[in-house]
UniProtKB/Swiss-Prot annotation:
Subunit structure comment from the entry: Myosin is a hexamer of 2 heavy chains and 4 light chains.
Free-text function comment from the UniProt entry: Actin-based motor molecule with ATPase activity that localizes to the mitochondrion outer membrane. Motor protein that moves towards the plus-end of actin filaments. Required for mitochondrial inheritance during mitosis. May be involved in mitochondrial transport or positioning.
Record region (Disordered): 1-25
Protein name: Unconventional myosin-XIX
Family membership noted in the UniProt record: Belongs to the TRAFAC class myosin-kinesin ATPase superfamily. Myosin family.
Secreted in keyword set: no
Free-text comment on this protein's domains from its UniProt entry: The MyMOMA (MYO19-specific mitochondrial outer membrane-association) region mediates association with the mitochondrion outer membrane via electrostatic interaction.
Organism of origin: Xenopus laevis (African clawed frog)
Membrane topology: Peripheral membrane protein
Molecular-function GO terms, alphabetical: actin binding; actin filament binding; ATP binding; ATP hydrolysis activity; microfilament motor activity
Length: 971
């Protein structure tokens, strides 16, 4: 930042002899520059503290560049640029920058935007967007940048982050999730081994594009994944640029195979393969064991792996086959003598006859009509082309098969996942000394991604601000629409002209194609050519810079022809894997696609279609951008070259992004969705209702006004100080005509208040529910008690009624029996009274009454037993035991009672046939009953019941018949 000069420094310079004093002028300038430099150095010391480039003032390319350099020198490699994260590749391992502890810290924080810039900030924000279910729910993280900027490493770290944070607390569920996450992570080394290679600009350059969808269930746990690949650079199998290498898997095999594997695959340690250049360079990616373990975890067993490596070894031997020029054009070219062995080994590994292999490589089959077949020997260059075509076709099919197998093992069923987070890793922008169709397609993909970024964050935001009435100073940005139209536009573009040449199937040299391009596309400013180059070429002005493309062989590469006889050769192979890769059912399709009169889908058309489907997915998701920056071309650690970084910053539109994001509102929600989601925040007295009933009753204008008033009510509840008189124009929120524009901080405030309101209302609902449940349980308990009381009362009444009926019957029967017994007893008593009384009184008079009383008093308190046999009639005992007699005896005085006892005992003693046990405790008769033979112990405890201690046993005596029945009844 420059400062105005002070008054003291604004002096007129002195003049000597009519000339200005240059020395004083120099001192004057040096002082002002010194002040400016001092201020600049102070600011420069603080530049590394700026986490967000939008806070740098002024926002210019120079200040942004200085800020990134200061942070890079301080060991800080991530910086926010508004809605984008800028990642500068350190080119060295950084301690604990990607550890699991750091991942958990970013995941557990309450405010990810408040943390230090990191790729985990972007990952966590996307993860929380899925949790909040704000439309669009699905997320995409687009990792872009030049080759070697760190895109592949960033994608790998993002996958590890999601595998770490999606773990479940449940042991069983967590074990299943970890198994799925392990398979998803194992797909990385396999895909990198077969799809990455060492180039001039990157040791681990992705030679294919991939879009990985991490599938999440309702609990936001990874249940599976799917991989989509784009445009594998299969030409690298047979053609490697100087100082570059083939795919990693070939070097892993050659360096990591065991002795037995080398013998089986015919890979001697000192072998020299023309398709395996620069194998002496040892790279971190040359780890064969990691690749084999990952393949095993993905369901590719050991025999299948062995089969794959045999085929790859066969391709290496196939590349060593060299042909000699034929002396006679009618004779096919023969392989050189020293390459005959390579042909035999290649045929053996591919399990095809060596004669068939050499024949199909050197002789072309021409079909004329349906049955006419001609064979024509090929020239040496054609033989080499057919050999390379065979290798490229096998490798491309093998790569597609690997992707299919990986998807079968990691992809979840559609019913098991609800949302996804996509990770896009495509080739970076490429510009080499010689560029052809591959670089044209790669740069076309980067142009489409840049257009998506521009349309999403720059153009769409400014257009939407203007449409919604947001006060906004428009910013000029670099629009690449003209370049995209040049490549894919309709009706005339570079791709359309290339496809037309392929459809015409005519021999057209590169110079003629160059003239067609210049004449047809001269109106577009993005195309040109190098007039000083002898080779036909054209130059395209991409967003990242100008690139010169060579036209030679471009049309032929676009056709990507595969001779049908080569497909037939592979279909005849005895190898099981090759039979899967080239099924016989495709024979007719192959003939139709390679017929001389018809051309199949071109490479450009196929790539354009797959890219369009990818862009549709990106447009349907919420995108997040990570811009990877390569600080130097040499990939040296902690080396920051401003010129190279500046080119990348300008190319990807970082400065324009910062300008818009600094004063912009990245989150836009319609009034209807806003009120629907945040209506719970409004105070109770506002009585807010949902806006959906207004659709049928009111017009759109009245509905919008009502929604706007409700929206203001909600915002006033969140920001009461900032919101005055329904005017919401501040740094946090702005209300347009149909949408509300929010910053991330405002969304966090709204979500926090919404969570508090939902928690409060949930607690209220819980309290109401609990009280309702308690009242319901009380009512149910009371009702159950009432029912139980009624049932018990009914049962009791029924039982009492039954008992009363039974008692009445028993009472009636007993009364009849009693009357009958009393009558019988009275009749018998009348007959035997005279004999008994005479005997009794005679014995009683023999001893005085006093002796009787004394004997009574001298009786011990124990049982007195005397034996007697009843002889005087069957009713004698019954008479004594009859109720009337008992009553009579009990009611008599003491003397008569004693007399009666003695009379009975004497009579029984005289008969000497029955034993009677008498229990006496006090005056009066306690018990007198006949008992069965054997000892019976009587207890003296008094019972309130009469005759409660009488043993009801059967009397084994001469009492039988009716008297026995009467005795039992009496007992």
């Amino acid at each position: 930042m420059s400062r105005p000069l002070s008054k003291n420094t604004e002096r007129e310079p002195k003049q000597i002899n009519g000339h200005q004093n240059n020395l004083s002028n120099h001192k004057h300038l040096s002082k002002s520059l010194e002040q400016e430099m001092k201020a600049f150095l102070i600011d420069e010391k603080e530049l590394h503290l700026y986490d967000d480039l939008t806070k740098v003032n002024p926002v210019t390319t120079a200040t942004v560049l200085k800020c990134l350099q200061a942070r890079y020198s301080a060991g800080v490699f991530y910086t926010n640029a508004g809605c984008t994260v800028v990642a500068v590749n350190p080119f060295q391992p950084v301690y604990k920058l990607y550890s699991s502890e750091v991942m958990k810290d970013y995941h557990s924080t309450s405010n990810p935007q408040g943390c230090k810039p990191h790729i985990f900030t972007v990952a966590e924000q996307a993860y929380r967007n899925v949790q909040s279910q704000i439309q669009p729910v699905n997320q995409s993280i687009i990792v872009s940048g030049e080759s070697g900027a760190g895109k592949t490493w960033t994608s790998r770290c993002l996958m590890k982050f999601y595998a770490t944070v999606s773990a479940s607390r449940c042991y069983i569920t967590n074990e299943m999730v970890e198994r799925i996450e392990g398979r998803v992570l194992d797909s990385n080394p396999v895909m990198e081994a077969f799809g990455n290679a060492c180039t001039l600009r990157n040791n681990n350059s992705s030679r294919f594009g991939k879009y990985i969808q991490l599938q999440l269930n309702r609990a936001q746990q990874i249940t599976g994944a799917s991989i989509q690949t784009y445009l594998l650079e299969k030409t690298r199998v047979a053609h490697q640029a100087p100082l570059e290498r083939n795919f990693h898997i070939f070097y892993q095999m050659f360096k990591g195979a065991s002795r037995l594997e080398r013998e089986e695959w015919n890979l001697p340690e000192k072998a020299n393969f023309s398709w395996l250049p620069n194998y002496e360079n040892n790279l971190e990616e040359d780890d064969f064991e990691v690749t084999k373990k990952a393949m095993l975890h993905l369901g590719i067993d050991q025999p299948t792996q062995n089969n794959i490596f045999k085929i790859l070894s066969g391709l290496l031997h196939l590349g060593n086959i060299k042909f000699s020029d034929s002396v006679d054009e009618s004779q096919p070219c023969e392989p050189l003598n020293y390459t005959q062995e390579f042909a035999s080994i290649a045929a053996n590994l591919l399990k095809i006859p060596v004669s068939h292999l050499l024949e199909r490589l050197s002789i072309r089959t021409i079909t004329a009509g349906k049955q006419q077949v001609f064979k024509k020997p090929c020239r040496k260059s054609e033989c080499d082309t057919r050999r390379d075509c065979l290798a490229k076709t096998i490798y491309a099919r093998l790569f597609e098969w690997l992707v299919t197998v990986i998807n079968e093992n990691i992809c979840a069923e559609s019913c098991r996942w609800n949302n996804f987070i996509g990770l896009l890793d495509v080739y970076g922008f490429e510009s080499f000394p010689e560029n052809n169709l591959e670089q044209l397609c790669i740069n076309y993909a980067n142009e489409k991604l840049q257009q998506h970024f521009v349309s999403h964050y720059l153009k769409s935001q400014q257009d939407e601000y203007a449409a919604e009435g947001l006060e906004w100073s428009f910013i000029s940005y670099q629009d690449n629409q003209s370049c995209v139209d040049l490549l894919e536009g309709s009706p005339i573009s570079i791709f359309s002209l290339l496809n037309e040449e392929c459809r015409l199937n005519r021999s057209l040299d590169a110079g003629q194609l160059q003239s067609r391009l210049e004449n047809a596309l001269s109106h577009n400013k993005c195309i040109g050519r190098d007039k000083f180059s002898k080779k036909p070429n054209f130059i395209v002005s991409h967003y990242a810079g100008k690139v010169q493309y060579q036209i030679e062989d471009m049309a032929e590469k676009n056709k990507d022809p595969v001779p049908p006889e080569l497909i037939q050769l592979l279909q005849e192979s005895d190898d099981h894997l090759l039979q899967k890769l080239f099924p016989v059912d495709n024979n007719k399709l192959v003939y139709g696609a390679t017929n001389n009169r018809a051309v199949g889908v071109t490479v450009v058309s196929k790539f354009k279609g797959s890219l369009e489907s990818l862009m549709q997915i990106l447009h349907s998701t919420t995108p997040h951008y990570i811009r990877c920056i390569k600080p130097n071309v040499d990939c040296q650690a902690l080396v920051f070259r401003q010129e190279e970084v500046l080119m990348q910053l300008e190319a990807c539109g970082i400065v324009e992004t910062i300008n818009i994001s600094a004063a912009g509102f990245p989150i836009r929600i319609s009034f209807e969705n806003f009120v629907e989601r945040y209506s719970v925040i409004a105070p109770r007295q506002s009585h807010m209702k949902t806006c959906f009933p207004l659709k049928k009753k009111q017009g759109s204008i009245e509905k919008t006004d009502q929604l706007s008033s409700k929206l203001h009510t909600i915002l006033q509840a969140v920001l009461p100080k900032q919101c005055k008189d329904s005017t919401l124009s501040n740094s946090l929120v702005h209300c347009g005509t149909t949408k509300v524009f929010l910053t991330h901080l405002m969304v966090e405030l709204l979500e926090e208040r919404r969570l508090i309101a939902i928690s409060s209302k949930a607690m209220c609902i819980q309290c109401c529910w609990r009280s309702y449940r308690q009242r319901k349980l009380a009512k149910q308990s009371k009702a159950a008690t009432t029912i139980q009381a009624a049932v018990k009362g009914w049962l009791t009444k029924k039982y009492i009624k039954r008992m009363h009926s039974a008692a009445t019957v028993i009472k009636r029967i007993w009364k009849k029996w009693k009357e009958k017994m009393e009558a019988l007893a009275a009749a018998e008593l009348d007959d035997s009274t005279e004999d008994v009384e005479s005997t009794l009184f005679s014995s009683m008079l023999a001893s005085p009454v006093k002796s009787l009383e004394s004997s009574k008093t001298n009786l011990p308190d124990k049982i007195m037993t005397q034996s007697a046999i009843l002889r005087f009639g069957t009713l004698g005992l019954v008479l004594y035991g009859a109720p009337a007699i008992r009553k009579y005896i009990v009611e008599t005085d003491e003397l008569k009672r004693n007399q009666n006892i003695l009379m009975c005992l004497n009579m029984l003693h005289r008969n000497n046939r029955y034993k009677v046990t008498v229990n006496r405790e006090e005056p009066g008769i306690t018990s007198i009953r006949a008992r069965p033979q054997g000892s019976i112990r009587f207890h003296y405890k008094r019972s309130p019941l009469h005759f409660a201690n009488i043993c009801p046993g059967k009397i084994n005596c001469g009492i039988t018949g009716f008297n026995e029945i009467l005795l039992e009844k009496t007992v």
